[in-house]
């Protein structure tokens, strides 16, 4: 498995809404993520900095990147655009992190 870490931001007044939307995540998005090889996907919130830390294990970089091409993902991005900084294509502004330590 390939471990991926990344950070995003959530708007300061949208913490509860961000969580609520993820509690009610689109079932079709869950299926797309799983079918594209995503496992152990978690997102953590640092409320003081409005920072989101994402962690996911993937089977293959290409399959992971292909999730962004799915209708379910595009629909989710559009749905989330008002609660977080987003790019012109509605994808969340994110920064991939470099792994500097791992303990198995």
Curated annotation (Swiss-Prot):
Record flagged with keyword Cytoplasm: yes
Enzyme Commission number(s) from the entry: 5.1.3.32
Transmembrane annotation, as ranges: none
Top EC class of this enzyme: isomerase
Subcellular location: Cytoplasm
Pfam families documented for this protein: rhaM
Disulphide-bonded residues: none
Annotated active site: 22 (proton donor)
Residues annotated to bind substrate: 18, 41, 76-77
Pathway(s) annotated for this protein in UniProt: Carbohydrate metabolism; L-rhamnose metabolism
InterPro entries according to UniProt: Dimeric_a/b-barrel (IPR011008), L-rhamnose_mutarotase (IPR013448), Rham/fucose_mutarotase (IPR008000)
Quaternary structure note: Homodimer.
HAMAP family, A to Z: L_rham_rotase
Name recorded for this polypeptide: L-rhamnose mutarotase
Organism of origin: Mannheimia succiniciproducens (strain KCTC 0769BP / MBEL55E)
Lineage of origin: Bacteria, Pseudomonadati, Pseudomonadota, Gammaproteobacteria, Pasteurellales
Gene: rhaM
């Amino acid at each position: 498995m390939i471990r991926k870490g990344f950070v995003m931001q959530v708007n300061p007044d949208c913490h509860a809404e961000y969580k609520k939307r993820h509690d009610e995540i689109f079932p079709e998005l869950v299926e797309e993520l799983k079918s594209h090889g995503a496992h152990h996907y978690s997102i953590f919130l640092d409320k003081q900095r409005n920072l989101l830390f994402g962690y996911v294990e993937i089977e293959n970089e290409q399959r992971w990147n292909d999730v962004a091409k799915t209708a379910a993902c595009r629909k989710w991005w559009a749905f989330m655009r008002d609660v977080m900084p987003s790019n012109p294509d509605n994808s969340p502004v994110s920064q991939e992190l470099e792994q500097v330590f791992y303990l198995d």
